[in-house]
Amino acid sequence: MDLKQYVTIVPDYPKEGVQFKDITTLMDKGDVYRYATDQIVEYAKEKQIDLVVGPEARGFIIGCPVAYALGVGFAPVRKEGKLPREVIKVDYGLEYGKDVLTIHKDAIKPGQRVLITDDLLATGGTIEATIKLVEELGGVVAGIAFLIELSYLDGRNKLEDYDILTLMKY
């Protein structure tokens, strides 16, 4: 199935010059959303995943149905101040400054095989920070899965030590 036909390109959003890839027009078609999820599930089965981890918010949209299909748990990575219990955190760079990502300190057990999911691989900064959180807790990043990769932003270069699945490339 050609998933690109279900992604809407929104010009000049959120700012001029950006061609935003809107996945809601993929998700609102149950058979297409299921197909995309199933592709990631098949990839994850080969990796013997114990836990799925995804950064907010679209990492949840991808990761939760994958975790459900695999029969494993899901651990959210959130911005600072959004998780209620003790967390670990990591600072990461954005094009306009810095931000902080957190995960519950007890979310991952040492040695657990983790699949990281997100909707889009752009510069790789968010996923690089997510990897640091997973590894700090002793998790093993067994794979990383994205719906979309923006190849021209070279985010994959930051993640060259990891196995990556992308369902669409632009």
Swiss-Prot record:
PANTHER family the record matches: ADENINE PHOSPHORIBOSYLTRANSFERASE
A Pfam family that the UniProt record links to this protein: Pribosyltran
Organism: Bacillus subtilis (strain 168)
GO molecular function: adenine phosphoribosyltransferase activity
Assigned keywords, A-Z: Cytoplasm, Glycosyltransferase, Purine salvage, Transferase
Protein name: Adenine phosphoribosyltransferase
Functional note: Catalyzes a salvage reaction resulting in the formation of AMP, that is energically less costly than de novo synthesis.
Family named by the database record: Belongs to the purine/pyrimidine phosphoribosyltransferase family.
EC number, UniProt record: 2.4.2.7
Keyword Transferase: yes
Gene Ontology BP terms: adenine salvage; AMP salvage; purine ribonucleoside salvage
UniProt-listed NCBIfam families: apt (TIGR01090), PRK02304.1-2 (NF002633), PRK02304.1-3 (NF002634), PRK02304.1-5 (NF002636)
Pathway stated in the Swiss-Prot or TrEMBL entry: Purine metabolism; AMP biosynthesis via salvage pathway; AMP from adenine: step 1/1
Highest classification ranks of the organism: Bacteria, Bacillati, Bacillota, Bacilli, Bacillales
Assembly description: Homodimer.
